Amino acid sequence: MSYQEIKSIVALVSTLLINGLYGWYVFWRYQQEAPGVAELFRFWAVAMLIFMGVALVAQILITVVFRAAYRRITGETEPSFADELDRTIGLRATRNAYYAFALGLVVALLTQVLSLPPVALFATMFLAGIASEVAQALTQLYYYRRGV
């Protein structure tokens, strides 16, 4: 397996793990606090802002650990350049991530058109973010395996 394939798998697993654990924690807290209508938007705003920080720090730590482990296990350093193939795959993965997030955003807005509770809006937006990261990692893995 190439460095890029392993990196895509690590990104996919870490995304699912970080988002899954944080999502479980937030929904557990939501049930414990049972915020009323007045506090609902504040609850979700705080939860999402904290998540951005937690996810950023976790991704940085995972990247550092991955690079160190890769270097230690294989004895190779990660490629210091990106060729045309890497750029093309990166662009396609980013495009698919945007599509996944845009679709999730439309579904989130539809929850309000259908008069679902506001928690459905926030949960759908949270899931759209996860779907976009997963789409990006899967697209990269697919194209590194199959080729462009």
Name every feature range the model reports, one short phrase each:
Residues Y98-P118:
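Alpha-helical transmembrane segments and their membrane-interface junctions
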Residues G20, L61, L103-L110, L138:
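Hydrophobic residues within the alpha-helical transmembrane core of Major Facilitator Superfamily
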Residues T77-A97:
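Short membrane-interface loop/juxtamembrane segments of multi-pass integral membrane proteins
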Residues R42-I62, L127-G129:
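Alpha-helical transmembrane segments
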Residues M1-Q31, L138-V148:
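Cytosolic-side membrane-entry/anchor segment at the start of a transmembrane helix
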Residues L121-V148:
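Alpha-helical transmembrane segments and their immediate juxtamembrane interface regions
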Residues A58-E76:
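Membrane-water interface of transmembrane alpha-helices
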Residues W28-F41:
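Membrane-interface helix termini and inter-helical loops of multi-pass transporters
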